[in-house]
């Protein structure tokens, strides 16, 4: 009796087990994003009430308290010199010099100048040191009013959120007025009026082009550089460049520009 041939089932290879790495990576990214959102939310709900400075002039800022605490730790007392001046009583030349030097697109942006930040990062990476800041006037105001100096991602996030809140709440004119009245111009020296009186013995409204440029040039590091001294080569170059940019915008005439060049070259 012949056996009937039956087809033999081919052995099927077991399906390869899927490794969970893709899912793990996806969950990890999601977890990080959720963590960032949670921290951002926490920071946002604890932001200062910037409505308070819409009309009220602050008598004290975070940077003032921080500087005084630094001196106290060394057993010293820092004398605070601070006089308030409305924008109408600050030299237009000083205002223009600040805008040109610190934030040339102040009236165009909404708190951040992305192009300036990119250029600053590229220049700093090229020089392998911080030689150019990318912060707008609004960001600088946020730091001075509410934050202690620090270089952390969360600190930058706080600064960014406060800057955005300032831009939404205050007019550009008010932001500029606040900035010019709380910015540091030396140890214990805050605001344009205090700087003008201390450095040049006059009101901020009476500053000459040379004095305005000298004051603005030291904003980068008022604890290292002096507005009344021309000894630093870096300051001389910075002042010459700022004078040139102001002259190009017809903020003063050619004889004044030539006089400034002579002054800042010595």
Language model features with spans:
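Juxtamembrane regions of bacterial inner-membrane/periplasmic proteins
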Residues: 2-266
């Amino acid at each position: 009796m012949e056996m009937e041939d039956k087809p033999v089932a081919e052995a099927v290879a077991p399906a390869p087990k899927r490794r969970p790495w893709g899912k793990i990576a996806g969950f990890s990214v999601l977890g990080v994003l959720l963590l960032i959102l949670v921290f951002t939310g926490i920071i946002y709900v604890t932001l200062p009430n910037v409505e308070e400075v819409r009309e009220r002039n602050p008598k004290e800022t975070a940077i003032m308290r921080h500087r005084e605490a630094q001196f106290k730790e060394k057993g010293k007392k820092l004398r605070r010199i601070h006089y308030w001046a409305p924008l109408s009583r600050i030299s237009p030349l000083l205002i223009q010099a600040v805008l040109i030097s610190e934030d040339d697109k102040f009236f165009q942006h909404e708190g951040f100048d992305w192009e300036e930040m990119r250029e600053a990062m590229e220049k700093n990476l090229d020089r392998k040191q911080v030689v150019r800041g990318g912060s707008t006037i609004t960001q600088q105001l946020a730091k001075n009013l509410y934050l202690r100096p620090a270089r952390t991602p969360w600190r930058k996030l706080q600064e960014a959120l406060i800057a955005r809140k300032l831009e939404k709440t205050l007019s550009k004119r008010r932001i500029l007025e606040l900035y010019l009245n709380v910015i540091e111009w030396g140890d214990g020296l805050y605001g344009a009026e205090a700087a003008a009186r201390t450095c040049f013995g006059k009101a901020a409204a009476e500053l000459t082009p040379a004095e305005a440029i000298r004051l603005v040039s030291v904003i980068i590091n008022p604890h290292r550089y002096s507005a009344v001294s021309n000894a630093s080569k870096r300051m001389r170059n910075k002042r010459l460049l700022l004078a040139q940019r102001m002259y190009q915008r017809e903020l003063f005439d050619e004889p004044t520009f030539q006089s400034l060049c002579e002054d800042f070259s010595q």
